[in-house]
Amino acid sequence: MGRSLKKGPFADAHLLKKIEAQADNDKKTVIRTWSRRSTIFPSFIGYTIAVYDGRKHVPVFVSEDMVGHKLGEFVPTRTFRGHNTDDKKTTAR
């Protein structure tokens, strides 16, 4: 179930403040954030945002196709190590 249209998209205020500060200084450094729930706005395009995955910050370069999605969608939190392989061969009884 999606967010109500009357509420509009959400982004943490501290993240918006960091992006506006970089836009004013014309600098593009990596922005570290823990806010996986923030929606990507068009003003985020071209910036690299390091999103926390529970262990480390993973850099995500924001492109035009990502607008409207959440930051957490692009950084998986679980590592899949594959299914257990059984190399047991059938033996004659």
Swiss-Prot record:
UniProt-listed SUPFAM superfamilies: Ribosomal protein S19
Keyword terms of this UniProt record: Ribonucleoprotein, Ribosomal protein, RNA-binding, rRNA-binding
Cellular component GO terms held in the UniProt record: cytoplasm; small ribosomal subunit
Single GO biological process annotation from the record: translation
GO terms of molecular function: rRNA binding; structural constituent of ribosome
Superkingdom of this protein's organism: Bacteria
Xref: InterPro entries: Ribosomal_uS19 (IPR002222), Ribosomal_uS19_bac-type (IPR005732), Ribosomal_uS19_CS (IPR020934), Ribosomal_uS19_SF (IPR023575)
PANTHER family: RIBOSOMAL PROTEIN S19P FAMILY MEMBER, SMALL RIBOSOMAL SUBUNIT PROTEIN US19M
Function per UniProt: Protein S19 forms a complex with S13 that binds strongly to the 16S ribosomal RNA.
Database matches in HAMAP family: Ribosomal_uS19
Protein family membership: Belongs to the universal ribosomal protein uS19 family.
Official protein name in the record: Small ribosomal subunit protein uS19
Organism of origin: Lacticaseibacillus paracasei (strain ATCC 334 / BCRC 17002 / CCUG 31169 / CIP 107868 / KCTC 3260 / NRRL B-441) (Lactobacillus paracasei)
Designated gene of the protein: rpsS
